[in-house]
């Protein structure tokens, strides 16, 4: 039910964390890897494995370390209170750079109005800090520091995070061999160092979305030479969902692996909802500011102004939004190119700006004021996510003149943003059939000079409403392999309705599979360790390890237990699919045991000799496949 002022209890008193989001994973523990200073503590999840059964040699299996986006929520040593928000992680790092000031209060007009409205007290997050801003004339972006040759704490943090204790895994004897990858020109090193991170950010090939007002953030990096990331969307609408439900979706989404979260709220109380989300988020938060700006003018796109939009940017930057989707590439001359499309303009932001351009017959004010926007971005270190407002909404419209015209403009805007040392990534489609996906990636790399690409799927067919997490997961895996840096998840409810918690989880797991498959295909160092460990556990019938090493242990365990629920089945050398007599892995073990007992190694020599004799006889008789008898 939607939160209203009439029935809302004081959220600052009543709000509770989602119980499912704070449960530790079975046989896992939160570990922290310390950096060069005591306050750089990088979280990871360590999965403890059982000893190999004596039938298979009785080997001790080292724990497996995996990337963890769940923040403090899965650390049993941390007391979670969503009413107070998460602990401050970054303030000491920001203070040490001595280039920001603490403001006396909010500087946006809208923010001040909301704060002074007593009727909103019931909904308001109670522990709001005064915002920071760059000192006059200063630039506080990670790109600016990188281009000055400075390795920030955030850069060191993400380097440690990306490596996931790879050296220790090798030393512990984990199977680290992996198939050779094909990276399509990416420059993936054998080890991620802080200096490599700095170089990639300075070059514009990677970004660390990290607003100076999002001090609860655990930094992460987005770029084609790093692990492929995924984004999950949340947000209320005019038709439903409360603030507490959106915070629950946030914590639930990051539990299952969402690297960033976009708040796409379009209903009431957008400002208050966003404050609760950011204060409780350990991952970067993105928004589409034009959505809130449109709410401020009652939904009339033609009434939007630069002044109102500017105030919205400042309002959100002071709350701590880490990246903004800005549809500055929707130019007046591109709008007619969409007229003959099957599905026209499907981006909400794109359609808003197209309507404004036509109503005023003027150029998009986001384009004409782009350098003004850059000034705001670098004062708070908000990253650009340059929106693809003309993305195709059906495979029939893929790779058309409107889409690629806008992409070329986004490349132009990227260079302007880089001139201001503002971190930038590029949004992409959409609906694209498989044979056209690589062209999208190649053109983006060319137009945008390798700025990180961030795509919605793409969906590879339009015939599967209710299953678009699958149609898009196919495209996501492909474009991730080709070089896309972040994949925006799609849930089963895409095109159908607002997703619930189960839909969020399904979308995230689907996209974690796609991202991981892309990492394997690119040959990212250490990407196959988890696969190898799970395969070994499967062959040795270590059922609990199979469950716990998977992306979704709960579902794997429940599927197994549907037919074999007893604890004794957890040590059985078969599952219900094949049963005890037809398990291929059990049969393989029996063959190995027989070979060992019968000294098959010696027999192999005789077999090879016999095969060689038969081959020579075949040649001597004329190499004829068939003979008359």
Swiss-Prot record:
Cofactor binding remark: Binds 1 [4Fe-4S] cluster per subunit. The cluster is coordinated with 3 cysteines and an exchangeable S-adenosyl-L-methionine.
Pfam families for this protein: ThiC-associated, ThiC_Rad_SAM
Protein family (similarity comment): Belongs to the ThiC family.
Cofactor(s) recorded in Swiss-Prot or TrEMBL: [4Fe-4S] cluster
Pathway involvement of the protein, from the record: Cofactor biosynthesis; thiamine diphosphate biosynthesis
Positions that bind [4Fe-4S] cluster: 575, 578, 583
Subunit: Homodimer.
UniProt region (Disordered), positions on chain: 1-20
GO biological process: thiamine biosynthetic process; thiamine diphosphate biosynthetic process
Name assigned to this protein: Phosphomethylpyrimidine synthase
InterPro entries per record: ThiC, ThiC-associated_dom, ThiC/Bza_core_dom, ThiC/BzaA/B
Gene (name only): thiC
Binding annotation for Zn(2+): 431, 495
The entry's keywords: 4Fe-4S, Iron, Iron-sulfur, Lyase, Metal-binding, S-adenosyl-L-methionine, Thiamine biosynthesis, Zinc
Protein's UniProt keywords contain S-adenosyl-L-methionine: yes
